[in-house]
Amino acid sequence: MKIKDESIKMSRSKPITDTDPDFIETKNSKTIFEICEMVRIEKEIGIITGRAGIGKTYSLKEYARHRQDILIIEADITFTPKVMIKEICTHLGIITGLSLHDMFEGLVEKMKTMDIMLIIDEAEHLPVRGIDILRRIHDRTGCGILICGLPQLLMRLKSLRGDYAYIFSRIGIGARLDAPTKKDVYAIVRSMMDADEKTCESFYEHSAGSIRILVKLVRRSIRVAQINQMPVTREIIAESAKLLTL
């Protein structure tokens, strides 16, 4: 791809890697840390929801990285209640070849003894019975539990009827996250490269409100600029955005 030079200049970029950039505190990460602390200290059931790509998982892992009493489980579409219990037991060092009842009792005792806070990420994949089991774990252990996922997680809990209608009322604290702010985007861009105001603005315009897309876009733009042996320009950023699967 041949790119003509424009006036936005960059003195140099940092080495390109496929790992995440250094953690940058954002408005959403501050909210996540605050909710996590309240859930941990007050032993509540909490919920955090937000669209994909805004840094939920990254912030949760950063929070847990600094503590020994946090267990994060990432749910997926295979997470039946049994799979969830086995996954928690595996992380707690509990034998998983036992009956479901014995595994449940084992994790209850281990969590109480260790005073573990449990975080379930991508919790929109959990069936309602799985969420009810988390409620039961909370009742039995007195430990804080946080579920985090896409906006439909909260909508699904609010719409529960019949035997599960009470679950939503058990949530003691929560937050709905917004798209990253312009300040957040600028800080992330500048953690990855030397960038002036106009360059940051261009990345903000093309990031579609997603930190995940933003990080990919910055890396792609730097690579394209290096291939063409020129600074990152608005045109390069726009062309690089077209190459991303948005």
Regions found by a protein language model. Give the residues of each.
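C-terminal alpha-helical "lid" subdomain
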Residues: 1-27, 31-34, 55-61, 165-166, ...
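A short helix-turn-beta junction within AAA+ P-loop NTPase domains corresponding to the substrate/partner-engaging
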Residues: 68-70, 160-179
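Phosphate-binding P-loop
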Residues: 36-43, 111
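Conserved catalytic segments around the Walker B and adjacent sensor/switch elements
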Residues: 67-77
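Walker A/P-loop nucleotide-binding motif
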Residues: 40-62, 76
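Residue-level preference for the first positions of well-ordered beta-strands
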Residues: 45-47, 69-70, 115-117, 144
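Sensor-1/coupling segment of RecA-like P-loop NTPase cores
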Residues: 45-52, 137-164
